UniProtKB/Swiss-Prot annotation:
InterPro entries: PRELI/MSF1_dom, Slowmo/Ups. PROSITE patterns: PRELI_MSF1. Induction: Up-regulated in response to activation in primary T helper cells. This is PRELI domain-containing protein 1, mitochondrial. Residues 36-174 form the PRELI/MSF1 domain. GO terms for cellular component: mitochondrial intermembrane space; mitochondrion; nucleoplasm; protein-containing complex. It comes from Homo sapiens. Highly expressed in fetal liver; less expressed in fetal brain, lung, and kidney. At the adult stage, expression is drastically reduced in the liver but highly expressed in the spleen, brain, lung, lymph nodes and peripheral blood leukocytes. Involved in the modulation of the mitochondrial apoptotic pathway by ensuring the accumulation of cardiolipin (CL) in mitochondrial membranes. In vitro, the TRIAP1:PRELID1 complex mediates the transfer of phosphatidic acid (PA) between liposomes and probably functions as a PA transporter across the mitochondrion intermembrane space to provide PA for CL synthesis in the inner membrane. Regulates the mitochondrial apoptotic pathway in primary Th cells. Regulates Th cell differentiation by down-regulating STAT6 thereby reducing IL-4-induced Th2 cell number. PANTHER family: MSF1/PX19 RELATED.
């Protein structure tokens, strides 16, 4: 049984800009799990397509229950191969990625197609597919569920990283994420509530003092 993922995202930048950002997206604040990237092969075909292969080293900690199944000396780093085909004439880029170690535990294969958005030629559409499989007897389903959840989390980080690099390349200040904005709003609301509480205490204290003074006048 294989877990399948299908998703579609849109970047509000042109295909040329996204293509340029693709090769410059590491490092970024959302890719701390990506340790290294190396181009191991690159060529231009007779029909002017760019073929590339990169080796990425990532750190993805296993769940604790999975760590018990492997020796302590097993590397926690994951080596990922990425093949890409860029067709500048048709403005498409297709990438294929898969892990080459820890394959007994889990294999995650991903295919992405970057193309011009059909509704807005100044935007780029990303169609993403992934297949998560495991050959571990007895726990393969749990491993696949974990792998799919981790993959979805990494997709979110990938898109945030893309937006960050695109903003830098375009000379803009990277926009805050919704989570960061919500967190700041929550902190501000907490500060406002605290200030209001302190003010209320102060007013209550002054009122009590005034009342006490009035009572003393009638004694």
């Amino acid at each position: 049984m294989v877990k399948y993922f299908l998703g579609q995202s849109v970047l509000r930048s042109s295909w040329d800009q996204v293509f340029a950002a693709f090769w410059q997206r590491y490092p970024n604040p959302y890719s701390k799990h990506v340790l290294t990237e190396d181009i191991v092969h690159r060529e231009v075909t007779p029909d002017q397509k760019l073929l590339s292969r990169r080796l990425l080293t990532k750190t993805n900690r296993m769940p604790r229950w999975a760590e018990r199944l492997f020796p302590a000396n097993v590397a926690h780093s994951v080596y990922v191969l990425e093949d890409s085909i860029v067709d500048p004439q048709n403005q498409t880029m297709t990438t294929f990625t898969w892990n080459i170690n820890h394959a007994r535990l889990m294999v995650v294969e991903e295919r992405c197609v970057y193309c011009v958005n059909s509704d807005n030629s100044g935007w780029t559409e990303i169609r993403r597919e992934a297949w998560v499989s495991s050959s571990l007897f007895g726990v393969s389903r749990a491993v696949q569920e974990f792998g799919l959840a981790r993959f979805k989390s990494n997709v979110t980080k990938t898109m945030k990283g893309f937006e960050y690099i695109l903003a830098k390349l375009q000379g803009e200040a990277p926009s805050k994420t919704l989570v960061e904005t919500a967190k700041e709003a929550k902190e501000k609301a907490k500060e406002t509530a605290l200030a209001a509480t302190e003010k209320a205490k102060d007013l209550a204290s002054k009122a009590a003092t005034k009342k006490q003074q009035q009572q003393q006048q009638f004694v």
